[in-house]
Amino acid sequence: MRTSRTLAVALCAVALTATAACGKDGSPGGSAASSASNAPALPTYTVKTDVKVDSPVIAEAKKRGQLIIGAKADQPFLGWEDVASGDRSGFDIEIAKMIAADLGFTPQQIKWQTLVSSQREPAIAKGQIDFYVGTYSINDERKKTVSFAGPYYIAGQDLLVKNDNTSITGPESVSGKNVCTATGSTSIKNIQQYNPKITQFDTYSACVEKLLSGEVDAVTTDDAILKGYASKYAGKLKVVGKPFTKENYGVGLNKDDKTLRDAISDALKAHEDNGDWKKAYDATLGLSGSAAPAVPTLERY
Amino acid sequence: MSLFDRPATASVLYDVPGPKARARYRLFGILSLLGVAGLLWYVIATLADNGQFDADLWDPFQYNAVQQMIVDGLLSTLKAFGLAAALSLTLGALLATGQLSDHRPVRWTCTAVVQFFRAMPLLILIVALYYAFFAKDPMWALVLGLTLYNGSVQAEIIRSGVNAVARGQGEAAYALGMRKSQVMSSILVPQAVRSMLPSMIGQLVVTLKDTSLGYIITYNELLFMGKKIASQPLNAAGFPYIPVVLVIGPIYIALCLLLTALARWIEARGRRGANRRTSAAA
Amino acid sequence: MGFLFEQDNFALFRDGFLQTIELSALSALLALLLGTLLAAFRVSPVPILRAFGTTWVTLFRNTPLTLLFFAVTFGLPPLGVHFSHLVFAVLALGGYTASFVCEVIRSGINTVPLGQAEAARSLGMSFGQTLTLVVLPQATRTVLAPMSSVFIALPRNSAIAGAFSVPELYSAQQTFSERGYSIFAIFFWVACAYLLISATIATLFRFLETRLAVAR
């Protein structure tokens, strides 16, 4: 019994690795956030040495030599992971790298953990991750379980529709229409008052697939996220362009760790002031065609 | 055409077909084959029209990193399955012992535990364990959830297996002056095991399939990897959900069939050892 | 525990509960019909139908239900099949459970004494008549016990639909934990709901067993 199962497992593994032996390395050119040759270059950040942050989370991270940062992986230009190369890119990823540098961690010392919207609060509260950077809107309900540093970006909820759709022009026109959004996001509550039929998946990419296949009429969430998809599927999808909420993106972290919150706020402030923020924006979200907005003022508490 | 001409003799439900019936069956056969083939053709043609077989959509699978992800996912699935299988069989044996106990409180407690975990959706159990205790280590939420549920089912299988042994066996053993533990370990369980094995391994197949629920709690198993490949496409051709299902599905099916084959082999061996009469198949 | 009666929580919980019941009932119906049909295929004299039944059962029994949900939710729309997510869930859950129902019925058919089918055939009954008038009614009794485990498992499995845009109990649980309530309190109520459902089904089957036992 034991031997035949081991044999079976070994056979499967061999079969798979055998096919794996003839694969390609790297990733195809022109993937989501990697860009044309004349695109603005990503900034590099000087890693601080000798950082003294008296936070249990950072002490733990120092001990393990790795900073565990939660992020999204399926949002072009914001939080994207290329499955072929394993590289992460996007504005949220840059923000996370800036903060990591100021906390004394090189990009190689960052361990990324992909988390979908509904998994964020438990993962932060229970310490699965050190902090989270991924289109995380600051609101009071969430402040009951986690705390936020930021905002580092201000987005607004908008609608993504098919290119030839003329009937959806704003939130007022979605009544009775089929609208898709992600479980555990603030977008659900905001759109509910306009009476659409709501479809929910755990990721926005599932929603976009449903939009492409015609199952839903629109996808709603923050314009920053939608713009990424619209430019990835240029010619097929468009953003309606009438934001109807204001979403303050913050870095989510442990509720009681004020030291870490202040350290992250300081890091954001420093990189906003020295121009890294703008450079990072131009090299990521800026590629989807919209100019850099004003840097939002940090709220410290 | 041997498939159509093979005389159907194996069943008691119908007579060996004569020439007319054979012709009729052949007609049915051809019609249903046409129907199935037509449906299959429609599915494949529509999917092809839809661009589901375009090289661009299948592109991810040719990269080393993606293939490595699938192998890693498979290994994580097998790891969770191995742990859950071992733990659930242990828990099952313990709970079954409790359920067969002579002490009423023990019996009632074990029965309550078994009934509770048999009724709870595994998904909800796993998510609750993840949120409450194992956010740092999702694998243990998955393994523990699988253990609690499958352990309860295994306990039921063991209990009913032991109860199904002819009553005279136990009575004879008691009459010889054996203690309860002796009756159990040397008379009842050895006889019960033979009849229990197929259902126990069947439940292990269920355990293997249910490891896929780990994707919901960020455990990097096979389905989690598949979902990642599907939702992070390398190009703008769309999301390769169908290619991923076509790649991941057969892997799961192959694993389960291997386990089932094992079950059948053990069953056959057990039958041989018991000198049982082979029962007539319908 | 008291959170259930705050805000609109109870309405959400009740809707989720009813949706779970609706989903389970529809899937059970589909599974029963399809499963019986597949079982008839698997014992039929037409080899192609037997092969079809065997293939279906092999495919659906050995694929994780979650993967089936993916296949149905993302695989059918490109085929031009557009339904609500509830119907998709019923198809996935019903098709999956049908393969188990089929196996239970098939083994039930095998337990009917040979003489019964032989007698029916010697009276000149066709395959269809033998099956529907003589064998299946007798098999019903022996399949009740294994069938009850299949149908108790069904509402449990239906929780997976919550991750595929069907607002049932699991997705109510998700919403509650997003609202920041204690996971233990949420789990308590959801557990109560599922225990109620499975106890009801178990009672129903026990009732059927006693009813049919009298007829024997």
Q: How should each PLM-predicted stretch be described?
A:
Chain A
Residues 110-122, 166-167, 183, 199-213, ...:
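Short helix-initiation/N-cap motifs at beta->coil->alpha
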Residues 154-161, 223, 227-268, 288-301:
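Periplasmic-binding protein-like
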Residues 19-33:
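Bacterial lipoprotein signal-peptidase II cleavage site
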Residues 88-103, 136-137, 155-208, 223-227:
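Bilobed "Venus flytrap"/periplasmic-binding protein-like clamshell domains
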Residues 23, 38-52, 185, 251-289:
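Extended ligand-binding regions for polar small-molecule ligands
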Residues 108-173:
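Acidic, polar ligand-binding/catalytic clefts
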Residues 119, 135-144, 212, 217-246:
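A ligand-binding cleft/hinge motif common to bilobed small-molecule-binding domains
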Residues 32-42, 47-132:
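Extracytoplasmic small-molecule ligand-binding "clamshell" domains
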